Amino acid sequence: MITLGVDPGSIVTGYGVIGKSEAGFRVFDYSAIRPGGKCDFPQRIKYIYDTLEKVICAYKPTQLSLETAFYGKNAQSALKLGQVRGAIIILAMNYNLKFVEYSPREVKKSVAGTGNASKEQVAYMVKKMLSIDDEKMALDTSDALAIALCGHFKSASMAASEFKKQSRKATSWGEYILQNPQVVVK
């Protein structure tokens, strides 16, 4: 499974593409998208969309993990963030990607072990987990990689849980019928 993690922002949007192999995680790409403040807002959204579309076409992820909206005190910033998130969600739907989103607390907990971790602690853990030696990595980018890792961990956990449900053995004929109603001929 290849996961594209996105830390959305109206000024800087971070992204990271990771996959899991037998040897561990593989990092395909990561960067910060900076449309520039001189273009108008719709052009910034288009720039973010176009850049992420190129990433999707290049790496063919199966899942897009996005951080849920952060609710700050500035309503205008929240509206802009919502528009960026909307464009990213549409992009995921256009490419039939599994779309999942996680709160900042969930992401921090899955990577750093605590939902109260600082951005710097998250960046440190991401670099350790993915064997990245990049002193200049933007925090938006390390957040995006953390979001991708969280998506990967949660998907693997859900798959294991579903497998457990499917492989439960019935201890009696009645339980078998209850667990498999499709086998009953009426």
Swiss-Prot record:
Role summary: The RuvA-RuvB-RuvC complex processes Holliday junction (HJ) DNA during genetic recombination and DNA repair. Endonuclease that resolves HJ intermediates. Cleaves cruciform DNA by making single-stranded nicks across the HJ at symmetrical positions within the homologous arms, yielding a 5'-phosphate and a 3'-hydroxyl group; requires a central core of homology in the junction. The consensus cleavage sequence is 5'-(A/T)TT(C/G)-3'. Cleavage occurs on the 3'-side of the TT dinucleotide at the point of strand exchange.
SUPFAM superfamilies with a match to the protein in the record: Ribonuclease H-like
Entry binding sites for Mg(2+) 2: E67
Protein known as: Crossover junction endodeoxyribonuclease RuvC
Gene from which the chain derives: ruvC
Subunit structure: Homodimer which binds Holliday junction (HJ) DNA. The HJ becomes 2-fold symmetrical on binding to RuvC with unstacked arms; it has a different conformation from HJ DNA in complex with RuvA. In the full resolvosome a probable DNA-RuvA(4)-RuvB(12)-RuvC(2) complex forms which resolves the HJ.
Species of the source: Chloroherpeton thalassium (strain ATCC 35110 / GB-78)
Molecular function terms, GO-annotated: crossover junction DNA endonuclease activity; DNA binding; magnesium ion binding
Enzyme nomenclature, EC number: 3.1.21.10
PANTHER family found in the cross-reference section: CROSSOVER JUNCTION ENDODEOXYRIBONUCLEASE RUVC
GO biological process, one term: DNA repair
One Pfam family recorded for the sequence: RuvC
Lineage, opening ranks: Bacteria, Pseudomonadati, Chlorobiota, Chlorobiia, Chlorobiales
Keyword DNA repair: yes
Entry-linked InterPro entries: RNaseH-like_sf (IPR012337), RNaseH_sf (IPR036397), X-over_junc_endoDNase_Mg_BS (IPR020563), X-over_junc_endoDNase_RuvC (IPR002176)
Binding site for Mg(2+) 1: D7, D140
Subcellular location: Cytoplasm
Active site, UniProt feature: D7, E67, D140
Similarity-based family: Belongs to the RuvC family.
Assigned GO CC terms: cytoplasm; Holliday junction resolvase complex
Cofactor binding, note field: Binds 2 Mg(2+) ion per subunit.
Keyword tags: Cytoplasm, DNA damage, DNA recombination, DNA repair, DNA-binding, Endonuclease, Hydrolase, Magnesium, Metal-binding, Nuclease
Cofactor(s) of this protein: Mg(2+)
KW GTP-binding (keyword) present: no
Catalyzed reactions: Endonucleolytic cleavage at a junction such as a reciprocal single-stranded crossover between two homologous DNA duplexes (Holliday junction)
